[in-house]
């Protein structure tokens, strides 16, 4: 066996070795990484490899299976490995800092990788990282009633639990004052049409208000995202002092479980089917629907209780009802009414059913019960 095949075999064995963490990407956790940074000594996935290639001063990459590896580099990989390197570069990651997963957008992965290896923000011998307090800056915000993005000043007052934005740079009166209590932030790059697109949502007069923003700098928008998470953590610690920090972190921000177009009919189920954009918020157990994906407010919402309360989702349409263009139907049953929907494909239908049934089969939290009591009457729009 030549050096090439022998070292390839050693690397593949190292990928599968127990207690190394090598079986998953060191940066996003994707399974079965096929690439490695031989300058850092870690195994990474194809997507994260693309980020590493952009920073040759901190990382150099090779394919585990296709490139040649000499003995010294293989020994370096054996001496390091994912868990050892993560222990060094992720020694002090703040609880609020979002660690991207495999399906997250590129800007989150890029800034995570740069924060770790280029800026070395989380090493044990670095400066103490504290919760960010106030933050002020400019973001490009989409207009409520049009598609134009305009530069707006945003001010985060973490201790007061408030986010404000202003239409005038020197203005004293904010256009909106947003409570951190009801705020969520999620990257929606495809929907917004910008690689740094961030969607901020909050409750206003019983509705969900959507703000769509971006910044030209990837670092700036991710810093804003993590600052909002830090402010949320401060609020939750004060609101729930008896809960450990680890139980609060999952509630800092959340992604939609599923989004996409479906067609729906009205409450009488005789109205024409109309195309609507749906977003499933599993934490608040709400299915929101919009006329367009970038609308400022939802047209309506469905609170999703659980099976014991008479909620269910099933395949197909009620007898005698036919959809418009799309034939793959599903029906959501609530104590108040049925919601009859059609999906663009059977694949989408099954994905929606799986997501909806996952929510309906989970127990309600006290927050969910409060949401149900205050919003159940709003689902018929």
Swiss-Prot record:
<dbReference type="GO" id="GO:0043325">
    <property type="term" value="F:phosphatidylinositol-3,4-bisphosphate binding"/>
</dbReference>
<dbReference type="GO" id="GO:0043231">
    <property type="term" value="C:intracellular membrane-bounded organelle"/>
</dbReference>
<dbReference type="InterPro" id="IPR037851">
    <property type="entry name" value="PH2_ADAP"/>
</dbReference>
<feature type="zinc finger region" description="C4-type">
    <location>
        <begin position="25"/>
        <end position="48"/>
    </location>
</feature>
<dbReference type="GO" id="GO:0007507">
    <property type="term" value="P:heart development"/>
</dbReference>
<keyword id="KW-0862">Zinc</keyword>
<dbReference type="GO" id="GO:0005096">
    <property type="term" value="F:GTPase activator activity"/>
</dbReference>
<dbReference type="InterPro" id="IPR011993">
    <property type="entry name" value="PH-like_dom_sf"/>
</dbReference>
<dbReference type="GO" id="GO:0005737">
    <property type="term" value="C:cytoplasm"/>
</dbReference>
<dbReference type="InterPro" id="IPR001849">
    <property type="entry name" value="PH_domain"/>
</dbReference>
<dbReference type="GO" id="GO:0043533">
    <property type="term" value="F:inositol 1,3,4,5 tetrakisphosphate binding"/>
</dbReference>
<keyword id="KW-0343">GTPase activation</keyword>
<dbReference type="GO" id="GO:0005740">
    <property type="term" value="C:mitochondrial envelope"/>
</dbReference>
<keyword id="KW-0677">Repeat</keyword>
<dbReference type="GO" id="GO:0008270">
    <property type="term" value="F:zinc ion binding"/>
</dbReference>
<comment type="function">
    <text>GTPase-activating protein for the ADP ribosylation factor family (Potential). Binds phosphatidylinositol 3,4,5-trisphosphate (PtdInsP3) and inositol 1,3,4,5-tetrakisphosphate (InsP4). Possesses a stoichiometry of two binding sites for InsP4 with identical affinity.</text>
</comment>
<keyword id="KW-0963">Cytoplasm</keyword>
<dbReference type="InterPro" id="IPR001164">
    <property type="entry name" value="ArfGAP_dom"/>
</dbReference>
<dbReference type="GO" id="GO:0005546">
    <property type="term" value="F:phosphatidylinositol-4,5-bisphosphate binding"/>
</dbReference>
<dbReference type="InterPro" id="IPR052589">
    <property type="entry name" value="Arf-GAP_dual-PH_domain"/>
</dbReference>
<feature type="domain" description="PH 2">
    <location>
        <begin position="255"/>
        <end position="361"/>
    </location>
</feature>
<keyword id="KW-1003">Cell membrane</keyword>
<feature type="domain" description="Arf-GAP">
    <location>
        <begin position="9"/>
        <end position="131"/>
    </location>
</feature>
<keyword id="KW-0863">Zinc-finger</keyword>
<dbReference type="GO" id="GO:0005886">
    <property type="term" value="C:plasma membrane"/>
</dbReference>
<keyword id="KW-0479">Metal-binding</keyword>
<protein>
    <recommendedName>
        <fullName>Arf-GAP with dual PH domain-containing protein 2</fullName>
    </recommendedName>
</protein>
<dbReference type="InterPro" id="IPR037849">
    <property type="entry name" value="PH1_ADAP"/>
</dbReference>
<dbReference type="Pfam" id="PF00169">
    <property type="entry name" value="PH"/>
</dbReference>
<dbReference type="Pfam" id="PF01412">
    <property type="entry name" value="ArfGap"/>
</dbReference>
<dbReference type="GO" id="GO:0030674">
    <property type="term" value="F:protein-macromolecule adaptor activity"/>
</dbReference>
<dbReference type="GO" id="GO:0005547">
    <property type="term" value="F:phosphatidylinositol-3,4,5-trisphosphate binding"/>
</dbReference>
<keyword id="KW-0472">Membrane</keyword>
<dbReference type="InterPro" id="IPR037278">
    <property type="entry name" value="ARFGAP/RecO"/>
</dbReference>
<dbReference type="InterPro" id="IPR038508">
    <property type="entry name" value="ArfGAP_dom_sf"/>
</dbReference>
<feature type="domain" description="PH 1">
    <location>
        <begin position="132"/>
        <end position="233"/>
    </location>
</feature>
């Amino acid at each position: 066996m030549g050096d090439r095949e022998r070292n390839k075999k050693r690397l593949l064995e190292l990928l599968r070795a127990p207690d190394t963490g090598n079986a998953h990407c060191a940066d996003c956790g994707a399974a079965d990484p096929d690439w490695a940074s031989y300058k850092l000594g870690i195994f990474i996935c194809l997507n994260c490899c693309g980020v590493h290639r952009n920073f040759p001063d901190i990382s150099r990459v090779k394919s585990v299976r296709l490139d040649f590896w000499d003995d010294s580099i293989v020994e370096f990989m054996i001496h390091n490995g994912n868990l050892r390197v993560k222990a060094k570069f992720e020694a002090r990651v703040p609880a609020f800092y979002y660690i991207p997963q495999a399906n997250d957008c590129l800007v989150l992965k890029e800034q995570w990788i740069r924060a770790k290896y280029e800026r070395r923000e989380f090493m044990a011998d670095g400066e103490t990282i504290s919760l960010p307090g106030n933050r002020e800056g400019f973001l490009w915000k989409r207009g409520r009633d049009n598609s134009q993005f305009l530069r707006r000043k945003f001010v985060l007052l973490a201790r007061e639990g408030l986010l404000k934005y202003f239409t005038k740079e020197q203005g004293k009166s904010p256009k909106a004052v947003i409570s951190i209590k009801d705020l969520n932030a999620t990257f929606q790059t495809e929907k917004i049409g910008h690689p740094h697109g961030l969607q901020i949502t909050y409750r206003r007069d019983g509705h969900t208000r959507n703000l769509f923003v971006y910044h030209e700098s990837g670092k700036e928008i991710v810093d804003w995202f993590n600052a909002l998470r830090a402010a949320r953590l401060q609020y939750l610690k004060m609101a729930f002092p008896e809960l450990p920090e680890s139980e609060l972190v999952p509630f800092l921000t959340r992604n939609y479980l599923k989004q996409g177009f479906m067609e729906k009919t009205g409450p009488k189920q005789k109205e024409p089917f109309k195309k609507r954009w749906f977003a499933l918020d599993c934490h608040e157990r709400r299915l929101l629907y919009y006329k367009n994906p970038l609308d400022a407010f939802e047209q309506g919402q469905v609170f999703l209780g659980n099976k014991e309360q008479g909620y269910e989702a099933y395949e197909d349409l009620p007898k005698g009802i036919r959809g418009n263009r799309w034939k793959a139907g599903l029906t959501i049953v609530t104590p108040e009414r049925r919601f009859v929907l059609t999906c663009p494909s059977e694949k989408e239908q099954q994905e929606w059913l799986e997501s909806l049934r996952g929510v309906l089969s989970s127990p309600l939290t006290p927050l969910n019960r409060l949401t149900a009591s205050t919003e159940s009457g709003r689902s018929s729009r």
